């Protein structure tokens, strides 16, 4: 055998081997494919059965839900049907009742028609009888029916007038007695329900010190400290033998309070000299102004009054440092406000409005300007200026009869003002006249041009007038003091003599840096 034959057999062997491998591989692949397909069919069948079960469960669930809904709707329909049947029965019963009532009404109508015919017949007979009797009476009395009627009316009229007059007089007397009793009851109840302290305002303040050594420091060298404090505060300081006490005298409570607080701060600080005194007095004056505003706010809050203008609140706070015939003005105004509210409630009026008018009724006593205008009219102008209601303004202006009373609140304010001021010990006219005289002294001096401040001290026996250095000169100072003295002699009544001191001070301040 040659090489060719070997190669041929080798090739045929390879072909046969490859064919056998291919057949075996094909058989294996076919078997594997059939296994995979069988497994897939089994899994598909399982999934199919699972899905069928899920669908069946959902179907059964939906079927159950639908059956429940159908049952509920059937129940509702049955309920509605039963209600409709009940309503139908009710309507049928009502229809029967209406039919029955209609039959009864027809029967009553027939009876009324018969009765009306009988009444008409009787009326005709009565008219005929009346005519016959009237003619018979006229023939007997000799008077016609009209004349007899007129005489009867006149007789009845006179009798009615007499009875009415007696009845009216009786009602008037009873009303007077009732009104008098009711008025007394209201006033007594109002006074009983307002309990206030009675305290007479003085024109001096006692400043207590720890030791008499401080007196010398307050007086200063040759009295310069005490003079500086008197000039800055506008009050008289009395240092005598009274142990541990200094008396601050002045008719203006604001000035006395400023001097007291300034002294307190100076003594605590220890530095007492004219420059420090002026600085402290200026600082304390601002503090007192803030305290005045705070007092006004507390007062209106305590009384439950809202919506007041800030300037009115400031004036109310300033009442704390004003007095009327020795009676503290703020206490008097609060008392009057409470009395007005109680009395207005008893009379069926607005208590809040009455309380507001009572608080503001003496607001015209607070400002220092326009002294020639009565305080009631000045108070009314202030209320009008700060947009208070017309009946409030009228009550303030009319409580001393300067203007006509236009509302029911005005007489209440007038009465309550009188009640508050008429209590035993509430007022002291001598002090009021004294304070008015000192105030008139200061206002007289303030009327001159160039005057900055005026202070009446030593119970009105000395008037200190401070003028601006830029508006006057030394030559005019003496002329001014003489003019003021002459006017005081001509226009005012005063005991003893009044010393007029005009102070003109020029200062030049520089700072070294």
Swiss-Prot record:
It is found in: Cell membrane. PANTHER family: RIBONUCLEASE Y (PTHR12826:SF15). Residues 203-263 form the KH domain. It holds the Pfam family KH_1. GO terms for cellular component: plasma membrane. Residues 77-96 are annotated as: Disordered. Its main location: membrane. One of its GO terms (molecular function) is RNA binding. Its EC number is 3.1.-.-. Endoribonuclease that initiates mRNA decay. This is Ribonuclease Y. It comes from Porphyromonas gingivalis (strain ATCC BAA-308 / W83). PROSITE patterns: HD, KH_TYPE_1. Residues 329-422 form the HD domain. Coiled coil: none annotated. The chain crosses the membrane at residues 3-23. Residues 82-96 have a biased composition (Basic and acidic residues). One of its GO terms (biological process) is mRNA catabolic process.
